[in-house]
């Protein structure tokens, strides 16, 4: 057991040192404060799919006016038009101009539809960031290590592509999937040695298993590349501060692992834009309150 723990620590250290020198703004040390010993600063982004009925220009305007620092742009999941529109109409220079106009940073492309390869060059030329995708089908507990190793081996070409385009690939946990449980998170971080690969943690799916979100955050550690502030409730109650989950322990855990990305309030469902904006404003304020409460222990 001690050897396994030492191995995990060494692998995590390798991931940290490998990523530190090449990390784009999406995962930069800006999230860690002015110095290694400084207080962790929470940064907020949100996803364009929340405004999928609007153009990408209008979505960026809404997100910026709400005070978010960065954006996660979605491909065609549930018909979201934004990323394909950027690819076909704006291109990397047009996207950079649009984001600069609204003083937004590019955090991520969510590529559940289309895959990373399709958007890798665009992401790199737009400044680099995180590409979020799923894992693979579930497996029996006794098969977990072998299946995770095979899955990560299969991602090596994508990790090389991410390095070429100064980007990162974050694998999201999901119900009924390979990456779904605390044990699967442990297997991922133990086996993964690429600084280009990490985890996109969706607490919604952690909660469905009645597992601890702070524990999941701490297991992921420096391999946590994307964090959804997202709870297991229906409708708008999936959002922070709208649903009942106390996310202060989540924020404290993010600070403990010195999470380098943005905290991304999220929900599935597509209310009218003004309703969505009002709920995201509640989430923004709520997360800031959580950070304030947690900061005593940060």
Residue ranges and their predicted role:
Residues 25-54, 58-62:
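C-terminal segment of N-terminal export signals and the immediately downstream linker at the start
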């Amino acid at each position: 057991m001690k050897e396994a723990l030492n191995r995990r620590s060494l692998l995590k250290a390798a991931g940290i040192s490998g990523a530190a020198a090449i990390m784009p703004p999406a995962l930069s040390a800006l999230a860690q404060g002015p110095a290694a010993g400084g207080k962790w600063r929470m940064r907020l982004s949100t996803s364009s799919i929340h405004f999928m009925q609007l153009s990408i220009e209008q979505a960026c305007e809404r997100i910026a006016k709400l005070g978010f620092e960065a954006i996660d742009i979605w491909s065609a999941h549930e018909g979201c038009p934004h990323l394909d529109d950027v690819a076909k109409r704006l291109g990397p220079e047009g996207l950079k101009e649009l984001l600069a106009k609204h003083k937004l940073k590019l955090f991520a492309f969510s590529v559940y539809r289309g895959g990373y390869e399709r958007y890798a060059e665009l992401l790199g030329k737009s400044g680099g960031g995180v590409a979020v995708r799923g894992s693979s089908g579930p497996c029996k507990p006794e098969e977990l290590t072998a299946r995770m190793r095979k899955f990560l081996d299969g991602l090596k070409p994508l990790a090389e592509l991410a390095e070429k385009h100064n980007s990162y690939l974050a694998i999201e946990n999901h119900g009924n999937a390979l990456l779904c449980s605390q044990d699967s998170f442990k297997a991922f971080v133990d086996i993964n040695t690429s600084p280009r690969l990490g985890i996109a943690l969706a607490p919604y799916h952690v909660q469905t298993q009645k597992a601890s979100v702070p524990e999941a955050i701490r297991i992921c550690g420096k391999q946590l590349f994307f964090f959804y502030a997202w709870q297991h409730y229906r409708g708008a109650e999936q959002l922070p501060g709208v649903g009942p989950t106390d996310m202060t322990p989540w924020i404290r855990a993010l600070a403990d692992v010195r999470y380098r990305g943005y905290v991304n309030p999220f929900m599935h469902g597509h209310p009218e834009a003004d309703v969505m904006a009002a709920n995201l404003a509640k989430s923004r304020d709520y997360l800031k309150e959580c950070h304030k409460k947690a900061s005593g222990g940060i």
